[in-house]
């Protein structure tokens, strides 16, 4: 049953297969075929008055449809307003508004629909694009490709919209036997029955007044028996059909219809009431052409199915099957498609879900878009109301500069004897070092790759108030000043003014939070009694801004455990520090309950010439900033380090160790071998095994290690 409203979206001034309500004001009417569900309002008084008051409104249809319509006296008033258009012949039509005189020309082409005699499809072409209205149609697969008027040259015309017959647009009706297959099955049944005797009669139980003429003609031609029908009026001008039908009831094939219902003549199954003249009873079988019944079957059936003692069902369809609809639409490939009929038990949403993937508009909207991922450095904050067209990643922002979070306080100039080598300092307390992560831009060999999911950014503020959480890795380009360190260790600032810039332990290592309660401090052994792991790192050029790579990010870091260690009570922690091209190398130590011994060695000029400004970590010994305090003094103070010895660049510094966590001490036991390989410094010599054994043995015993350098290397 058609549910088409009668108006095309592209050409609303036309009315097709619907002639009531707003359609009455249309400038032209079109009728695809003479079935009642497509003729609503066609003989209504309102439309009749509209025709009487208009001189230009016409009804366009095929010649067969015109003959079928005018054979019914109820539509006789249309005789002067019907224009028959030749099938497959493009025709120019002028649409004139009788009120304003506005005129629009469109081209319409009638294409065979294969639904019933006279049924056509309308192809409209005009300023608003090409539109195809199928009405009811039955086209076999590949038949659309054979229609020349659907093509422009060798390609299919650019069709904007298709108003489609979707009666069987349901997977249940995926395949419907073709008319030839149905005809073959019916023909065999009728032949086998009628040849038994002249009293064996077949009744074709057809529900429509017309539409089965294809079946009648072929049965008559094959068997030589005319088909009995109720009326011949509608076919009087169609001799090709009229020759195969008759009103004579004494024939073996009947297609007559009951006036009201199937029980019109009880005891006789023929609606016409024919009986044998000599009293011999007739043997009648009924064949009901149907499609819906076969679609409801679960199992595959034959074209002809026996449903009773003398009743049969024959699969015979006037509408395209599901697969035929898909074939037609995939070949036409319109921009839009609109269903004219809803399948039994279906909905418009389900039908559109099936049809839309075959439309070009759907393909354009769902075509995958390949976009570059962009910079994967951090999550981009976006408004939640952004549409789906937004990119997943921010490709417009440049790399975020690595700057310290707190720069409110200006760094104080270093009050040392060498102001030309002084660096800018960041005045931060130890708690600030624990709670915050400061970022700085690196100038050498820095792999800047942060992958963030907004968790790190959100946790920055929370870390300021929660000392129990782990701190993020710190990469600092500046050194903390002496005043800040002195205040953290309880030493007055006036005692520290003579000290040079002091690098903080947190500048090089990730700090793990330690509970500073007195209870924990009592449980920790002093660093003087405890043995620790060694850490090797190198400083960059003292003239330029220092650049560092944190131990957790550096690929050159490794862990070295002490050889011959005797446990906690045997030795002190030793840290080996290497400085490149630094002019001042003096040390002062501040302890808080314990001490460590640190060895600082100065690289030779040959080593400083290498373009390696990264820190080489030879052991990871995380601690808080308040645990390690170092002062760098002038080079002249080196000479007073040891009496009777040559000037050295390797010194021992005691480093406070008051808050080592048990977890960190337990980890040292497992560091029995190097975890990574340390790349050699350019132009450096590989130390011999016996020298390394001797060096480690002295380090394990807590003894000072001095390296004599030749005068030319100073």
UniProtKB/Swiss-Prot annotation:
Residues 427-440, 484-500, 532-543, 562-577 have a biased composition (Polar residues). Its main location: nucleus. The modification Phosphoserine is found at residue 670. Residues 447-468 have a biased composition (Acidic residues). Phosphorylation on undefined residues by PRKDC may stimulate endonucleolytic activity on 5' and 3' hairpins and overhangs. PRKDC must remain present, even after phosphorylation, for efficient hairpin opening. It comes from the Eukaryota. Residues 391-500, 516-577, 598-617, 638-683 are annotated as: Disordered. The keyword Nuclease applies. One of its GO terms (molecular function) is damaged DNA binding. Required for V(D)J recombination, the process by which exons encoding the antigen-binding domains of immunoglobulins and T-cell receptor proteins are assembled from individual V, (D), and J gene segments. V(D)J recombination is initiated by the lymphoid specific RAG endonuclease complex, which generates site specific DNA double strand breaks (DSBs). These DSBs present two types of DNA end structures: hairpin sealed coding ends and phosphorylated blunt signal ends. This is Protein artemis. It comes from Gallus gallus (Chicken). The gene is DCLRE1C.
């Amino acid at each position: 049953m058609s549910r088409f409203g009668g108006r095309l979206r592209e050409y609303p001034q036309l009315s097709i297969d619907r002639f009531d309500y707003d359609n009455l004001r249309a400038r032209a009417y079109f009728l695809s075929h003479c079935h009642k569900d497509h003729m609503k309002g066609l003989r209504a008084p309102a439309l009749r008055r509209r025709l009487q008051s208009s001189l230009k409104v016409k009804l366009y249809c095929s010649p067969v449809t015109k003959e079928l319509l005018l054979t019914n006296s109820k539509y006789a008033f249309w005789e002067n307003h019907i224009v028959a258009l030749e099938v497959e012949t493009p025709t120019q039509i002028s649409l004139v508004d009788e009120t304003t005189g506005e005129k629009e020309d469109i081209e319409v082409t009638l294409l065979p629909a294969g639904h019933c005699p006279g049924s056509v499809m309308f192809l409209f072409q005009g300023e608003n694009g090409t539109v195809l209205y199928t009405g009811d149609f039955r086209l076999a697969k590949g038949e659309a490709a054979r229609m020349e008027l659907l093509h422009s040259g060798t390609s299919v015309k650019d069709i904007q919209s298709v108003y489609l017959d979707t009666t069987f647009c349901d997977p249940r009706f995926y395949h419907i036997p073709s008319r030839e297959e149905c005809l073959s099955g019916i023909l065999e049944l009728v032949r086998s029955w009628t040849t038994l005797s002249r009293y064996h009669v077949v009744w074709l139980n057809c529900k429509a007044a017309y539409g089965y003429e294809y079946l009648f003609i072929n049965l008559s031609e094959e068997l030589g028996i005319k088909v009995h029908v109720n009326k011949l009026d509608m076919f009087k001008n169609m001799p090709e059909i009229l020759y195969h039908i008759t009103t004579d009831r004494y024939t073996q094939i009947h297609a007559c219809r009951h006036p009201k219902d199937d029980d019109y003549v009880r005891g006789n199954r023929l609606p016409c009431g024919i009986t044998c003249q000599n009293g011999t009873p007739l043997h009648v079988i009924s064949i009901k052409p149907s499609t819906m019944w076969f679609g409801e079957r679960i199992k595959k059936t034959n074209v002809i199915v026996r449903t009773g003692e003398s009743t049969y069902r024959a699969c015979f369809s006037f509408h395209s099957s599901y697969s035929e609809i898909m074939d037609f639409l995939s070949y036409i490939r319109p921009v839009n498609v609109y269903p004219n009929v809803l399948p039994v038990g279906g909905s418009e949403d389900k039908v559109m879900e099936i049809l839309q993937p075959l439309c070009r508009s759907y393909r354009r909207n769902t075509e995958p878009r390949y976009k570059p991922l962009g910079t994967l450095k951090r999550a981009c904050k976006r408004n939640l109301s952004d549409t789906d067209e937004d990119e997943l990643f921010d490709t417009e922002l440049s790399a975020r500069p690595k700057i310290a979070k707190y720069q409110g306080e200006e760094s104080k100039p270093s009050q040392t004897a060498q102001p030309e080598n002084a660096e800018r300092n960041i005045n931060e307390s130890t708690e600030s070092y624990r709670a915050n992560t400061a970022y700085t831009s690196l100038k050498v060999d820095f792999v800047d790759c942060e992958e963030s999911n907004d968790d790190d950014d959100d946790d920055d503020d929370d870390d300021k108030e929660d000392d129990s959480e782990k701190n993020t890795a710190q990469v600092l380009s500046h050194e903390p000043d002496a005043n800040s360190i002195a205040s953290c260790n309880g030493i007055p600032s006036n005692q520290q003014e003579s000290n040079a810039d002091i690098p903080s332990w947190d500048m090089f290592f990730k700090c793990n939070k330690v509970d500073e309660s007195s209870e924990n401090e009592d449980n920790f052994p002093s660093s003087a009694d405890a043995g620790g792991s060694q850490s090797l790192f190198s400083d960059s050029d003292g003239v330029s801004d220092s650049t560092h790579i944190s131990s957790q990010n550096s690929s050159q870091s490794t862990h070295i455990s002490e050889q011959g260690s005797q446990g906690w009570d045997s030795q002190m922690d030793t840290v080996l520090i290497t400085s490149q091209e630094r002019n001042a190398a003096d040390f002062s130590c501040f302890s808080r309950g314990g001490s460590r011994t640190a060895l600082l060695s100065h690289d030779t000029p040959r080593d400083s010439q290498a373009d390696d400004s990264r820190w080489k970590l030879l052991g990871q010994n995380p601690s808080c900033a308040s645990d390690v305090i170092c002062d760098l003094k002038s080079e002249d103070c080196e000479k007073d380090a040891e009496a009777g010895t040559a000037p050295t660049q390797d010194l021992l510094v005691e480093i406070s160790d008051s808050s080592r966590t048990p977890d960190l001490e337990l980890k040292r036991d497992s560091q029995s071998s190097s975890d990574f390989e340390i790349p050699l410094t350019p132009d450096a010599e590989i130390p011999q095994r016996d020298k390394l054994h001797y060096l480690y043995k002295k380090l394990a015993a807590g003894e000072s290690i001095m390296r004599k350098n030749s005068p030319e290397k100073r």
